[in-house]
């Protein structure tokens, strides 16, 4: 089964989680920081570091997990798909919040000033929140299913 068929086999909530992970990854090309003067911006890729790498790895791992779920594979117990996706969403959100406080420095003529936040970092935060919310919803469905059995 190809990855496109695997995505087609996902439930609506699992697709919502995939959308959140894709938003987190795609937001790296949007402006995350803007200079205090001149309208200059810095994207997530423009200020790439270990935190941004962790953000992309987390989003990629969530998408890889969802593709495996679409192919009919589940993680071994005690791991649950919903819990793993929620953890990925909270972790990605934590990374974005860290990057909100760890802004690059803008230097001009010997003066240093922090970049201001731009819209891309909030898009990434929204994607992380969507991933976490979908993971919690999936986990709730899993728990209800476990109680019935």
Residues of each region from the PLM?
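Compact integral membrane and secretory-pathway proteins
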Residues: 1-149
């Amino acid at each position: 089964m190809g990855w496109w068929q695997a995505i087609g086999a996902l439930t609506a909530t699992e697709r919502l989680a995939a959308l959140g992970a894709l938003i987190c990854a795609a937001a790296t090309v949007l402006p995350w920081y803007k200079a205090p003067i001149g309208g200059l911006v810095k994207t997530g890729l423009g200020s790439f570091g270990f935190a941004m790498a962790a953000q992309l790895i987390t989003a990629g791992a969530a998408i890889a997990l969802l593709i495996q779920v679409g192919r009919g594979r589940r993680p071994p117990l005690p791991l649950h798909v919903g819990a793993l996706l929620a953890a990925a969403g909270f972790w990605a959100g934590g990374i974005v919040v860290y990057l909100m406080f760890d802004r690059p420095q803008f230097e001009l003529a010997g003066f240093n000033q922090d970049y201001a936040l731009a819209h891309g970092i909030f898009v990434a935060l929204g994607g992380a929140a969507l991933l976490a919310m979908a993971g919690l919803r999936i986990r709730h469905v899993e728990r209800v299913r476990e109680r019935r059995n």
